């Protein structure tokens, strides 16, 4: 990406920020360049130079920049001296979360008539996480990762004959390799019970509805339209939600109000054999209770998130027949990066 001499838009991005969102700057550049000149400036990961310090030495004239996205590069009121035409700006702090707007900067923007844009929700990764949660569900029901691994070293995986008691599964037959001690087989016909009706949970619910599941959801913070979007029956009481769950998916974000929302009593009320899905944050449930029931072979677990990350080698959850595990991989896809850029760019006016 070469910088035009007098761009109308500029993207200033820290290499440290791109370690969190590696494809956003590329996607934002593609979106903006369709309607005008765009400069992209990358700052070193170790640099704490401000936006003004970066653009004044970037090899282009910043005085015509009207739209600015600063991704992981801090901005100070004094930087506006180098950006006299600036009218709209988006800031993201180095962590990749939040707006990056300080009180001093907000006051300076107000004086200059500069509009600040920020994400109003985290819908940019909703599709990626929801699809991953569905994939975890299918893998948990059908033991796909376990079969993949076993096929590499154990020819017995091809033997579907009744086992004569040497395996734990209660049934075995031609091409029937599910572990029916736990929820298994199809999503169709399953009682899927979801905590949440937001960007991730509503999508996951709609997927399960489309596959023929009986879906109910509990979310004390969601408005009624969210349940219609999900296609799920609204359950008003969490203790009722868990009582008949065959698949239980707590898919709310982790906040002070949701930490431990699913208590040990709720976990203990899950029916024997229930498949638990962890795809947003494990801490919304009582993780010790989930661990206890999984290790006792009372429920199964398909998880991309955990109470401790990275999960230490030797953790008793790893490698179990009733656990599918992946290393916190759900949210960051090319699609999520592109949506991060698209949803932010949509807030800017046309040039």
Task: Write out the residue ranges for each language-model feature.
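N-terminal glycine-/charge-rich "phosphate-binding" loop or analogous flexible N-terminal tail
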Residues: 1-73, 216
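C-terminal helix-to-coil terminal segments
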Residues: 2-8, 12-31, 124-128, 140, ...
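Phosphate-coordination loops involved in phosphoryl transfer and adenosine-cofactor binding
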Residues: 7, 188-192, 273
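Phosphate/diphosphate ligand-binding glycine-rich loop within oxidoreductases
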Residues: 63-166
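Glycine-rich, N-terminal phosphate-binding loop of Rossmann-like dinucleotide-binding domains
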Residues: 69-72, 93, 250-252, 280, ...
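Rossmann-like adenosine-cofactor binding region
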Residues: 76, 220-316
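Rossmann-fold dehydrogenase core element
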Residues: 107-123, 271-275, 290-307, 318-330
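Glycine-rich NAD(P)-binding loop of Rossmann-like domains
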Residues: 147-203
């Amino acid at each position: 990406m070469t910088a035009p001499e007098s761009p109308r838009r500029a993207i200033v991005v820290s290499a440290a920020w791109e370690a969190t969102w590696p494809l956003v700057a590329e996607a934002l550049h593609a979106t903006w360049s369709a309607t005008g000149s765009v400069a992209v400036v990358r700052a070193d990961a170790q640099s704490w130079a401000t936006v003004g310090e970066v653009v004044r030495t970037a090899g282009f004239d910043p005085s015509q920049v009207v739209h600015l996205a600063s991704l992981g590069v801090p901005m100070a009121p004094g930087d506006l001296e180098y950006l006299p035409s600036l009218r709209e700006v988006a800031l993201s702090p180095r962590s990749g979360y939040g707006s990056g707007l300080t009180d001093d900067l907000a006051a300076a923007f107000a004086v200059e008539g500069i509009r600040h844009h920020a994400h109003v929700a985290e819908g940019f990764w909703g599709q990626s996480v929801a699809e991953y949660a569905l994939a975890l569900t299918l893998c948990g029901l059908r033991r796909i990762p376990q079969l993949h691994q076993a096929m590499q070293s154990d020819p017995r995986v091809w033997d579907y004959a009744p086992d004569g008691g040497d395996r734990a599964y209660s049934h075995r037959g031609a091409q029937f390799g599910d572990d029916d001690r736990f929820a298994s087989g199809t999503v169709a016909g399953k009682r899927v019970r979801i905590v949440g009706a937001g960007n991730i949970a509503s999508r996951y619910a709609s997927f399960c509805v489309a596959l023929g599941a009986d879906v109910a959801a509990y979310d004390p913070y969601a408005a009624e339209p969210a349940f219609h979007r999900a296609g799920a029956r609204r359950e008003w009481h969490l203790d009722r939600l868990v009582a008949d769950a065959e698949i239980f998916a707590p898919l709310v974000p982790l906040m002070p109000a949701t930490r431990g929302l699913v208590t040990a009593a709720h976990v203990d009320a899950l029916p024997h054999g229930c498949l638990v899905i962890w795809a947003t944050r494990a801490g919304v449930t009582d993780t010790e209770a989930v661990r206890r029931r999984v290790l006792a072979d009372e429920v199964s677990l398909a998880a991309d998130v955990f109470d401790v990350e990275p999960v230490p080698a030797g953790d008793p959850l790893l490698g179990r027949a009733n656990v599918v595990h992946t290393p916190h991989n759900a949210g960051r896809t090319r699609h999520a990066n592109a949506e991060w850029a698209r949803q932010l760019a949509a807030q800017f006016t046309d040039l």
